[in-house]
Amino acid sequence: MQRQGTVRAPCSRIVDPHQKVNYTVCGWIITIISYLVVLFTLPLSAFFCLKVVQEYERAVIFRLGRLKHGGARGPGIFFIIPCIESFKKIDLRVVSFDVPPQEILSKDSVTVSVDAVIYFRISNATVSVINVEDAARSTKLLAQTTLRNFLGTRTLAEMLSSRDAISMQMQAALDEATDPWGVKVERVEIKDVRLPIQLQRAMAAEAEAARAAGAKIIAAEGEQLASRALADAADVIATSPCAIQLRYLQTLNSISSEKNNTIIFPFPTELIAKFIQSAAA
């Protein structure tokens, strides 16, 4: 059974956005002071405290450097304390990127250049912020490694004939590897498998030779069938005098229709029959 290449992402810690955070006494004092400052500076402070995220975005909020209880906010309006809280917006829309052409040595020792396109999105905004610095860039780098690992265990024939199956297997492996980063890989498409020029010429010559051999076989089979038909017709004509007469009339008719300027002198069929009988003897 053929082993498949697997790619594992670095282990990441588990984040529970609903776990309550226990602040120190100093942290609680700073928090209370910040709330009082915002309260006494209303309504001016409202311009700095109210933030908006779009339908396709989520906001991950940090208070005093720690993840705020409740998970990501959005879509809509949310409230932050400028002095002690910060936030980061995460786009949840599907993103696509091209994997640069990768030089890969196949299982049967053929060097090919393969490029692909990856479609992914952020499925968990909180995890993508906490566990990885740049989820998009990390996914791109991991996709290149996954492409090389998977295609390195395939033959050239499998790469050319089983693109869909390889793409689905790559998508499953890449999705599993990026799950700790809060990334969902939606689709993987192998765009092109480019062969060396010399190999392309060799494959073209082989295909041309195969077509020529097939044409010769078909021609030989046709000649064989025609020879059998002629032999059967000769047997029928030899055993039936009427068949000779009918064939003679058919030949005269075809000659007169094709060449109207040709003068035909009919030849007695009895003499033809004598020639045929003498030839058969």
From Swiss-Prot:
Protein name: Stomatin-4
Family membership: Belongs to the band 7/mec-2 family.
Compartmental location: Membrane
Keywords: Membrane, Transmembrane, Transmembrane helix
PANTHER family per record: BAND 7 PROTEIN-RELATED (PTHR10264), STOMATIN-4 (PTHR10264:SF131)
Pfam families to which the protein is assigned, alphabetical: Band_7
Signal peptide per UniProt: none
Chief place of localization: membrane
Protein encoded by which gene: sto-4
GO cellular component term, pick one: plasma membrane
Positions of transmembrane segments: 28-48
Organism encoding this protein: Caenorhabditis elegans
SUPFAM superfamilies from the UniProt entry: Band 7/SPFH domain
Membrane-topology annotation of the record: Single-pass membrane protein
